Curated annotation (Swiss-Prot):
Source organism of the structure: Homo sapiens (Human)
Comment text on domains: The sequence contains 4 internal repeats, each with 5 hydrophobic segments (S1, S2, S3, S5, S6) and one positively charged segment (S4). Segments S4 are probably the voltage-sensors and are characterized by a series of positively charged amino acids at every third position.
Name of the featured protein: Sodium channel protein type 10 subunit alpha
PTM field: Ubiquitinated by NEDD4L; which promotes its endocytosis.
Effect of residue 916 to W: Found in a renal cell carcinoma sample; somatic mutation
I repeats: 116-405
MF terms (GO), sorted A to Z: transmembrane transporter binding; voltage-gated monoatomic ion channel activity involved in regulation of presynaptic membrane potential; voltage-gated sodium channel activity
Catalytic activity, reaction form: Na(+)(in) = Na(+)(out)
Chain ranges inside the bilayer that never cross it: 342-366, 835-855, 1354-1375, 1647-1669
Sugar attachment sites: 284, 288, 312, 335, 819, 1312, 1328, 1336, 1686
Repeat (II) residue spans along the chain: 647-911
Protein's membrane topology: Multi-pass membrane protein
Length: 1956
């Protein structure tokens, strides 16, 4: 994009006059003329780039500063457009005071007002004025507030309508209405305004109260805020973009849900109507039972008002005695939950997908249909819910990233242009300098219209801003203390940082603390560092980014007070003005000439021009500085004067002492400990504290407050306020201390819990020393910053929908509230009658709970409105906007966010303090050791030579890593071998070696090495160690790592390795010879010891192999050292016999059969645990059998353990984690067995121990590869997960303590317990606790607490977990909202704004922290992939493209098509069946079949059933016919296609189901024939195969297919966890009372029932219901003395066990496993999308081979050259080369074999190359491919290519030339002979020379053709390009093409094909 030179003139801005309009008309006419001319030359037109509008001159943007100052008289006036793009458009621009660009049409507005009309100009001036938009914004906000009120008069509405009308009129007058560009209706935002106004008038004109719908549209006014606030439009753009992207996912979702809904319809229709009815009723009346009309004949489910559902199957729910299960007329939940018709089934499935109270539907369905249908729910939840919902997340994330990328690109484009402009200015300046004009002196020139601010002020600003002690302060004794300890890290600051994506318009992220080392200006450029830094021009000091404008610091006096002194008048050094060498692509010559044109000879003009250049540059710099400046210069100087305290030497001395004290690492440690202790004190508050305890807490609070105040005061004195307040942490401290002091002052007058909660923020001070917390807060900070606009959008959405709900449904809720409110309440909890409650409902929908409110809404209002409103909020708000939130959060995670602390180069003080303590500990230990060793000397073992594998690092970058992680001594040379005892000596002597600076792994420079020098590192490694030995060395290293953890002080010593290498290794002294072929000198800088002789290593390696037949040592070296008797000589008797025994055991243990046997036993013993349920005592035989098998298993496992001890030795056995697990579990079995024999088995701990045997399967699974991968991934993620868990706990601690402050003791209430039902005693009877005691005459009143409450911090955590998972949160919220004071009876919504506490917690505690789990797990996945990822990391993007294309190519080969039958009739059918039209017809029929299945309902008439039955028979007949036809035509080949087999099975099943339903009507109750019909639905999958167009959907399914293996592994692991937990649940909670979520079907009494419960809470659904009965501890909730059937007593739970059981299960399954599931899906979705965007996909190769089959029916893999042109044209997609294509094909230089045939692989390679373009990487990949192809096609014989197409063409042309020459020779000769005077014209033509192109070609070639020997010699498999074309392609120029083109295409067709 050209930079308009004119725009740099000083008179940039010209008024828009009639002349300007005439000029535009001329330009347009000229453009029209050129357009016509251009149409004649079509080809040129394509190549020209169309002009595009300039990015920084878009409407609504601010005009960049370098266009100059805008004169005051031109503000708001029409100006000529600066953007050259609009020079041919009838437009002009207007700038307001803030330099915002507005564009207007220069045509007449409303056909009346020209741009020069006074009225229109006034309107324009008003419309662009900033106050106008401000006024409108304020109006909108006021209007929004008014709309939330119900009590305001109607007239106010008219006022707003008038204001909006006025706004619209002004805009229409200024812009015109709609015909031309930039008119009013051309802006989509104005459509909104216009419709709002129109509807307002319609509503007023037709005064119908009924049209509340029209009044609702007023609400859309709130959306106008979007159009007024600029940043919001971008986010709305992203939203719309993501909604567009969701099209594919939406189709897939609807498709999947429809299929599932159909299955649900077939399986469950009518079932949910089954209820338990009193037995004495007459059966014939049952048809019209309705639970509304006759509630007394039903029995209700305990604790609810819902009738009890039941089923007639054996495994469904049963009725209690006296009741019978009958089908009634209505469904549960106001008749809205059912599968009775397709629509209701679809709604139920959508609810399952969004997982909203799905456990309720799950329980209802299983109760009525049977437990076996859990399978249906497993499929729907895992495939439907997890997969589809997360696909939405994946798509939204991707759309966001694309949008982000686009914005970044735009910014970069702007930046590039800006740099070009500056480059131009710089060149102008050079020219001026050459012409002798002093640019610096021009600063004082008054003539410059642009110099807005005086130079001195600017000079002030150009001084390096004092960020923390600026450059000049170094000289003064007061240099900033913070930076002294940073000085040593200057290297870090200036070294290579990770390239943050810098750009001009980046804003500093809110949480980022930019503090620079001393002597570094804010630009990151060191004084005197004048290298040219390529970087972002406008961004001065981004985070650690080097700015491109190196400024030399100005000479400054050391005293800041005299800053206004002599330097005031110095001209700034030129380096300020000349931006340093900015790296810009050079301008084209044309533009350079402009600078040196004759203008410069004109003296006055030159001066002015120079001035303008200078002032523009300075204004650019000003712009740059303003963006960086923190505060105005006058304030800076004032603050430096008054906030830096240096009054007298005593004071300075005090400062120095305090400085030492405050910066000491131990001070930081003390403060951190104080914060921790203070937090613990705050967390100890609880309900019912004793006065002494309370007093202790109070005193503690005072002490801590004093302590923190002292810390603050000391710091202020030590650092001076000026520097103290430049650190954000210090400001934070200061605020908290001030609030704490305030609270202490106010505490006497009454408790201010608001201020008390401020103290909680102290916890965040931990972030200073805890990097993860810091990072997390930053992530939240960053995303809140990025989310600022999104949050506003979300707020607007919530606001708009809340208002819509209030307007549309408010009245309905008021009038019909009795339908849905509880009997004793006036209002329901959730309603839309007022704005606040309406807002809460919308917020609740955003949390994912919509269905219950929707039922209530449908009960009171119009069903359609409710459905539309709730589903819209759900889809828009929850699925799109909330996922965009998550996308932003995930985006904030960068690779090492959580593992690496901030790399600001600052040593963490805490680490230093801890390191000092460590050193002290080591020294003490050493002193003690030396003291004792003097008194009793130890025998020192002989030092062994070390085996150190050389590090492959030559680069100096490695030094950092080496110094940090391996203590090698500072010399870097060889290290003396030393004994094992000395390993700490160098550390103690020189503690700086590895303790002082623990560099986190993320910061080590090795990462950089991986990034930029991956290949170097590899190649170096290969240089040093020959390839073969490398692997062996790695294996040795791995072995060493595996067996002994290496200490930092040693390499892998031979002693460490000895046990694994057998005895012999130790006895030899191994010579240290450098590796073969490597010189001594090549020893790398950081290595300790050169490599051992590889021969030696190779000799030892076999002994390391897995099938090593020799066992290890029994004992570790430590044992042998301390107890030499353990060292046995196995060569002497009697030990040699023992050795043989060990070898035998070893062989047994290592045998695969032994392993299989043990795994089988493990599975059996695990299975036996499943039988030990609640009813075991009623089955004596089973019990006896289990006891017996238990003993057998125990003995087997003990025997296995003993065998392994003997075989492996203790050392190996006890260093293996899996063996430890075994050991513990065997011990548990032993203990429980012993206890059984001693008759202690009923002791509770022993029973609990026995359940731990369920952990055994873990070991079996360690043998399964897939499972192990998941476990490894999990183990790898554990540190990060624990970190996040800890941070969550800290975050939640604040809310928990706050909850305790707000609600402790306020949840108690008086309840009435009658007939097993609980009810709250009305406030009129009981007011407080004492009333409850007094009124309790009947003994049925109880003063109880809500089970989950905020009485202490631990309970608070449980309550918060329920709120965060949205399970059970309602009861907690209701209790909080109803609470009054301690010991008072609650009152309905007495404390209504407590809802906000929960809203805030859900946003910060729930939303952010729980989604961090997804972030962390995904992050970890990516990191582990990086560690494991092989070639990917070292491949460029280009290489990857080729690699992927080739990968796909390799798996394919040509197949023989099914031969057409010879029989005439069969052939006819074959032609029909193989047509695409036939397939499409079948697809249409499948869809029709699906539709007829949708039509079915539960209560359909007999007639309808019959018709549907007939239709079904018709479809079965059609599909059978299709099947028969295909079998007839395709014969035995029919079964070679998977789809055909599938069809065949479906048809057989369909026929079977028809026969069954016809013969056995009686079987229907057991065996629904419709189930078979469900199978037919699977045929719909065929549609996806056919539609190549449905690429997006196929990508999504492809992602699913890719995810399946991983998901299966995760599922297995999840099953394992469920198994273990269900065994545990069976032993812990079998007898709990049935209430809430536990009943006769869902309980922990049998294994199956436990699994039902655990599957449900895998998604966290309904875990509160299962936990509730377990929290019962005594009356009235349960009876501890109730006898149970198995001999135990009581039906109470054990709260502690229950809470641990459920919280751990929720964390493992819901937070970790399910998030792994999400991570896999997101990952594979990205991969699949990348694959689908690649230029060549699998389909293209499939298509190639499909087309190939037609041209090569015998699958010979060759086609003739003559057929190639047609073949290339027949292909579709990117590989196709349309006709005329002969020239292109010839130039492809394809190898020919005898018979002019070409091999398919050659063609495919050439076509692939044609699509992907030339690339050097093809060669290696091609060779690779050929090998692969040969492997898959063994039939292929080698063949010799004898020529290539290009060679053939050349020979052909040569032949023609020779022929022509010969003909002319013959002609001349005959002429000479006959001596005829005149030559006939035709012969003259024939004799003429060949055309120009060919002559050029032959001259160029010198007519040299390659040797035959050179091409034909290579025999290849199949031929490679090189073998055939080596001699040619290097020499042949593209001139061939001209010769070929010049030849007539027609003649070339007739040419004779070449002979061999």
């Amino acid at each position: 994009m050209e930079f308009p030179i004119g725009s740099l003139e000083t008179n940039n801005f010209r008024r828009f006059t009639p002349e300007s309009l005439v000029e535009i008309e001329k330009q347009i006419a000229a453009k029209q003329g050129t357009k016509k001319a251009r149409e004649k030359h079509r080809e040129q037109k394509d190549q020209e780039e169309k002009p595009r509008p300039q990015l920084d001159l878009k409407a609504c943007n601010q005009l960049p500063k370098f266009y100059g100052e805008l004169p005051a008289e031109l503000i708001g006036e029409p100006l000529e457009d600066l953007d050259p793009f609009y020079s041919t458009h009838r437009t002009f621009m207007v700038l307001n005071k803030g330099r915002t660009i507005s564009r207007f049409s220069a045509t007449r507005a409303l056909w009346l007002f020209s741009p020069f009309n006074l009225i229109r100009r006034t309107a324009i001036k008003v419309s662009v004025h900033s106050w106008f938009s401000l006024f409108i914004t304020v109006t909108i906000l006021v209007n929004c507030v008014c709309m939330t009120r119900t009590d305001l008069p109607e007239k106010i509405e008219y006022v707003f309508t008038v204001i909006y009308t006025f706004e619209a009129l002004i805009k229409i007058l200024a812009r015109g209405f709609c015909l031309n560009e930039f008119t009013y209706l051309r802006d989509p935002w104005n459509w909104l305004d216009f419709s709002v106004i129109t509807l307002a008038y319609v509503g007023t004109a037709i005064d119908l109260r009924g049209i509340s719908g029209l009044r609702t549209f007023r609400v859309l006014r709130a959306l106008k805020t979007v159009s007024v606030i600029p940043g919001l439009k971008v986010i709305v753009g992203a939203l719309i973009h993501s909604v567009k992207k969701l099209a594919d996912v939406t189709i897939l979702t609807i498709f999947c849900l429809s299929v599932f809904a159909l299955v649900g319809l077939q399986l469950f229709k009518g079932n949910l109507k089954n209820k338990c009815v009193k037995n004495d009723m007459a059966v014939n009346e049952t048809t019209n039972y309705s639970s509304h009309r006759k509630p007394d004949i039903y029995i209700n489910k305990r604790g609810t008002s819902d009738p009890l559902l039941c089923g007639n199957g054996s495994d469904s729910g049963h009725c209690p005695d006296g009741y019978i299960c009958l089908k009634t007329s209505d469904n549960p939940d106001f008749n809205y939950t059912s599968f009775d018709s397709f629509a209701w089934a679809f709604l139920s499935l959508f609810r399952l997908m969004t997982q909203d109270s799905w456990e309720r539907l799950y329980q209802q369905t299983l109760r009525t249909s049977g437990k076996i249908y859990m399978i249906f729910f497993v499929l729907v939840i895992f495939l439907g819910s997890f997969y589809l919902v997360n696909l939405i997340l994946a798509v939204v994330t991707m759309a966001y990233e694309e949008q982000n990328q686009a914005t970044t690109d735009e910014i970069e484009a702007k930046e590039k242009k800006f740099q070009e402009a500056l480059e131009m200015l710089r060149k102008e300046q050079e020219v001026l300098a050459a012409l002798g004009i002093d640019t610096t002196s021009l600063h004082s020139h008054n003539g410059s219209p642009l110099t807005s601010k005086n130079a001195s002020e600017r000079r002030h600003r150009i001084k390096p801003r004092v960020s923390e002690g600026s450059t000049e302060d170094n000289k003064s004794p007061r240099s900033d203390p913070y930076n002294q300890r940073r000085m040593s890290f200057l290297g870090l600051a200036s070294g290579k940082r990770r390239a943050s994506h810098g750009s001009v318009f980046h804003f500093r992220s809110p949480g980022r603390d930019i503090s620079l080392p001393e002597g570094v200006t804010d630009d990151g450029v060191f004084p005197g560092d004048h290298e040219s830094h390529r970087g972002s021009l406008l961004l001065g000091g981004g985070a650690g980014q080097q700015g491109p404008l190196p400024r030399s610091p100005l000479p400054q006096p050391s005293n800041p007070d005299s800053r206004h002194g002599e330097d005031e008048h110095q001209p700034p050094p030129t380096s300020e003005l000349a931006p340093g060498a900015v790296d810009v692509s050079a301008f084209d010559a044309g533009q350079k000439k402009t600078f040196l044109s004759a203008e410069y000879l004109d003296e006055p003009f030159r001066a002015q021009r120079a001035m303008s250049v200078v002032s523009i540059i300075t204004s650019v710099l000003e712009e740059l500085e303003e963006s960086e400046q923190k505060c105005p210069p006058c304030l800076t100087s004032l603050s430096q004067k008054y906030l830096i305290w240096d009054c007298c030497p005593m004071w300075v001395k005090l400062k120095t002492i305090l400085f030492g004290l405050v910066t000491d690492p131990f001070a930081e440690l003390t403060i951190t400990l104080c914060i921790v202790v203070n937090t613990i004190f705050m967390a100890m508050e609880h309900h019912g504290m004793s006065p002494t305890f309370e007093a202790m807490l109070q005193i503690g609070n005072i002490v801590f407050t004093i302590f923190f105040t002292a810390e603050m005061v000391f710091k202020i004195i030590a650092f001076d306020p000026y520097y103290y307040f430049q650190k954000k942490w210090n400001i934070f401290d200061c605020i908290i201390v001030t609030v704490s002091l305030l609270e202490l002052g106010v505490a006497k007058k009454g408790s201010l819990s608001v201020l008390r909660s401020f103290r909680l923020l102290r916890v965040f001070k931990l972030a200073k020393s805890w990097p993860t917390l810091n990072t997390l807060i930053k992530i939240i900070g960053n995303s809140v910053g990025a989310l600022g606009n999104l949050t506003i959008i979300l707020a607007i959405i919530v606001f708009v929908f809340a208002l819509v709900g209030k307007q549309l449904l408010g009245e309905n809720y008021r009038n019909n509230r009795k339908n849905i409110s509880a009997p004793h309440e006036d209002w329901p909890r959730w309603h839309m009658h007022d704005f606040f409650h309406s807002f809460l409902i919308v917020f609740r929908i955003l949390c994912g709970e919509w269905i219950e409110n929707m039922w209530a809404c449908m009960e009171v209002g119009q069903k359609s409105i409710c459905l539309i409103l709730f589903l819209t909020v759900m889809v828009l708000g929850n699925l799109v906007v909330l996922n965009l939130f998550i996308a932003l959060l995930l985006n904030s995670f960068s690779a090492d966010n959580l593992t690496a602390p901030e790399d600001d180069g600052e040593v963490n003080n805490l680490q230093v303090a801890l390191a000092r303590i460590q050193v002290f500990g080591h020294r003490t230990k050493q002193a003690l050791c030396s003291f004792f060793s003097r008194s009793c000397p130890f025998p020192q073992p002989k030092a062994e030579p070390e085996l150190v594998v050389k590090l492959p690092l030559s680069s100096s970058k490695a030094e950092n890593h080496i110094a940090a992680n391996t203590a090698r001594g500072s010399s870097g040379g060889l290290q003396a071998p030393r004994g094992p005892r000395d390993e700490h000596s160098d550390f103690i002597a020189n503690p700086t070696v590895w303790v002082s600076v623990p560099i986190a792994e993320g910061e080590s420079d090795l990462d950089d090495l991986e990034d930029d020098g991956g290949e170097d590192a590899q190649s170096f490694q290969q240089e040093v160690i020959p390839k073969g030995q490398q692997e062996q060395l790695q294996q040795v290293e791995r072995c060493g790592d595996h067996l002994t953890p290496r200490s930092p002080g040693t390499g892998t010593s031979s002693e460490d390795l000895a046990p694994s290498l057998g005895e012999t290794w130790k006895d030899e002294s191994v010579p240290q010879v450098p590796a073969e072929g490597v010189d001594d000198t090549s020893s790398s800088e950081g290595s300790t010891v050169d490599c051992l002789d590889p021969e030696e290593i190779l000799r030892k390696i076999p002994e390391l192999a897995d099938d090593l037949e020799e066992p290890d040592d029994c004992f570790t070296e430590g044992c042998i050292r301390h107890c030499p008797c353990c060292k046995l000589d196995t060569t002497k008797s009697p030990w040699d016999v023992g050795w043989q025994v060990r070898k035998t055991c070893y062989r047994i243990v290592e045998h695969s059969w032994f392993e299989s046997f043990i795994i089988f036993m493990i599975l059996l013993s695990s299975g036996s645990l499943a039988f030990e349920d609640y009813y075991l005592d009623q089955k004596p035989t089973v019990k006896a059998l289990l006891e017996y098998t238990d003993r057998v298993f125990t003995f087997i496992f003990v025997f296995e353990m003993l065998l392994k001890w003997v075989a492996y030795g203790f050392k190996k056995y006890f260093t293996n984690a899996w063996c430890w697990l075994d050991f513990l579990i065997v011990n548990i079995s032993l203990i429980s067995l012993t206890a059984k024999i001693l008759e202690y088995s009923e002791v509770a701990p022993i029973k609990a121990l026995r359940t731990l045997r369920a952990l055994r399967p873990l070991r079996a699974l360690s043998r399964f590869e897939g499972m192990r991968v998941v476990v490894d991934a999990l183990v790898g993620a554990i540190p990060s997960i624990m970190n996040v868990l800890l941070v969550c706990l800290i975050f939640w601690l604040i809310f928990s303590i706050m909850g305790v402050n707000l609600f402790a003791g306020k949840f108690w209430r008086c309840i009435n317990y009658t007939d097993g039902e609980f009810s709250l005693v009305p406030l009129s009877i009981v007011n407080n606790k004492s009333d409850c005691k007094i009124q309790n005459s009947t003994g049925s009143f109880f003063w109880v607490n809500v089970k989950v409450n905020f009485d202490n911090v631990a309970m608070g955590y449980l309550a918060l977990l329920q709120v965060a998972t949205f399970k059970g949160w309602m009861d907690i919220m209701y209790a909080a909202v109803d609470s009054r004071e301690v010991n008072m009876q609650p009152k309905w919504e007495d404390n209504v704004y407590m809802y906000l506490y929960f809203v805030i917690f859900i946003i910060f505690g729930g939303f952010f922290t729980l989604n961090l789990f997804v972030g962390v797990i995904i992050d970890n996945f990516n990191q582990q992939k990086k560690k494991l990822g092989g070639q990917d990391i070292f491949m460029t993007e280009e290489q990857k493209k080729y690699y992927n294309a080739m990968k796909k190519l390799g798996s394919k080969k040509p197949q023989k098509p099914i031969p057409r039958p010879l029989n005439k009739f069969q052939g006819f059918v074959f032609d029909i069946v193989t047509r695409q039209a036939f397939d499409i017809t079948i697809m249409v029929l499948i869809c029709l079949n699906m539709i007829t299945m949708m039509v079915e309902t539960d209560d359909q008439s007999e007639e309808k059933t019959k018709i549907l039955g007939k239709i079904n028979q018709f479809f079965v007949a059609v599909f059978t016919g299709e099947c028969v036809m295909k079998m007839f035509a395709l014969r035995q080949y029919y079964f070679t296609n998977g789809w055909n087999v599938f069809d065949f099975i479906v048809v057989v099943l369909s026929i079977a189901s028809l026969i069954f339903s016809a013969i056995l009507k009686s079987l229907q109750s057991y065996f629904s024939p419709t189930l078979f019909r469900v199978i037919r639905l699977a045929r719909i999958g065929r549609i996806l195969r056919l539609i190549r167009a449905a690429k997006g959907i196929r990508t999504l399914l492809f992602a699913l297919m890719m995810s399946l293996p991983a998901l299966f592994n995760i599922g297995l692991l999840l099953f394992l966890v469920m198994f273990i937990y269900s065994i545990f649940g069976m032993s812990s909670f079998p007898h709990v009372r049935w209430e809430a979520g536990i009943d006769d079907m869902f309980n922990f009494q049998t294994f199956a029932n436990s699994m039902l419960c655990l599957f449900q809470i895998t998604t966290s659904a309904g875990w509160d219901g299962l936990l509730s009965p377990i929290l019962n501890t005594g009356p009235p909730y349960c009876d501890p003395n109730l006898p149970n059937s198995n001999g135990t007593r009581g039906d109470c739970g054990s709260p502690a066990v229950g809470i641990i059981f459920f919280t751990t299960y929720i964390i493992i399954s819901f937070l970790i496993m399910v998030n792994m599931y999400i991570a896999v899906i997101l990952e594979n979705f990205n991969v699949a999308t990348e694959e689908s965007t690649e230029p060549l996909s699998e389909d293209d190769f499939d298509m190639f081979y499909e087309t190939w089959e037609k041209f090569d029916p015998e699958a010979t893999q060759f086609i003739t050259f003559s057929a190639l042109s047609d073949f290339a044209d027949t292909l579709s997609g990117p590989l196709r080369i349309p006709k005329p294509n002969r020239n292109i094909l010839i130039q492809m230089d394809l190898p020919l074999v005898p018979g002019d045939k070409i091999h398919c692989l050659d063609i495919l390679f050439a076509f692939t190359k044609n699509v992907l373009g030339e690339s050097g990487e093809l060669d290696s990949l091609k060779a690779n491919m050929e090998e692969k192809f040969m492997a898959t096609n063994l039939s292929k014989s080698s063949y010799e290519p004898i020529a290539t197409t290009l060679r053939w063409k050349q020979e052909d042309i040569s032949a023609t030339v020779i022929q022509k020459a010969y003909r002319s020779y013959v002609l001349h000769r005959s002429m000479a002979l006959s001596n005829t005077p005149c030559v006939p014209r035709a012969e003259e033509e024939a004799a003429s020379l060949p055309d120009e192109g060919f002559v050029a070609f032959t001259a160029n070639e010198n007519c040299v053709l390659p040797d035959k020997s050179e091409t034909a010699s290579a025999t290849s498999f199949p031929p490679s390009y090189e073998s055939v074309t080596r001699g040619l392609s290097d020499r042949v120029n593209m001139r061939t093409s001209s010769s070929i083109q010049n030849e007539d295409e027609a003649t070339s067709m007739e040419l004779i094909a070449p002979g061999p």
